[in-house]
């Protein structure tokens, strides 16, 4: 089951990237789908092309930057709106909220950011740092349990 990620950035790449994550004796395919910008569902950027790729995924990962001018909550709402405007079925998919770049924020800000999502009873909320590796293993463990069990 492919997993989809989407960054909430105004700067976007030109094509999706596929990768395989090996986990224990199993593996799964991930698809990094860039280009989901505001207005993507109306054809802005490369949005429609990329949104079609998302339709084929099993689990969505919303990668939201902790160290950004746009709050993680607003990033999430914008991405969710674009998905819903393209297809309501996308909003029915299981998803993860992954707050990235947590190495760039203090503990109090991290706590408040994650609590915002937890207060809304989202089950799959993780924070990671690609630089330090913090939280990455826990995220992979959880995704793998969902896929392989």
Mark where each language-model region is:
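Canonical P-loop GTPase G-domain recognition
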Residues: 105-149
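Conserved RecA-like P-loop NTPase ATPase core
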Residues: 32, 50, 79, 139
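Phosphate-binding active sites in nucleotide-utilizing proteins
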Residues: 16, 43, 58
């Amino acid at each position: 089951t492919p997993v989809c990620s989407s960054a909430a950035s105004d700067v976007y790449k030109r094509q999706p990237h596929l990768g395989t994550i090996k986990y224990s004796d199993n593996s799964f395919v991930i698809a990094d789908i860039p280009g989901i910008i505001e207005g993507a569902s109306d054809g802005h950027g490369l949005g429609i092309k990329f949104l079609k790729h998302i339709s084929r995924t099993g689990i969505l990962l919303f990668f939201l930057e902790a160290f950004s001018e746009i709050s993680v909550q607003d990033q999430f709402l914008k991405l969710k709106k674009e998905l819903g405007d393209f297809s309501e079925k996308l909003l029915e998919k299981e998803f993860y909220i992954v707050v990235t770049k947590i190495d760039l924020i203090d503990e109090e800000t991290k706590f408040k950011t994650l609590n915002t999502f937890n207060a809304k009873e989202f089950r799959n909320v993780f924070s990671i740092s690609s630089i330090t590796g913090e939280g990455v293993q826990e995220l992979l463990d959880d995704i793998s349990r969902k896929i392989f069990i």
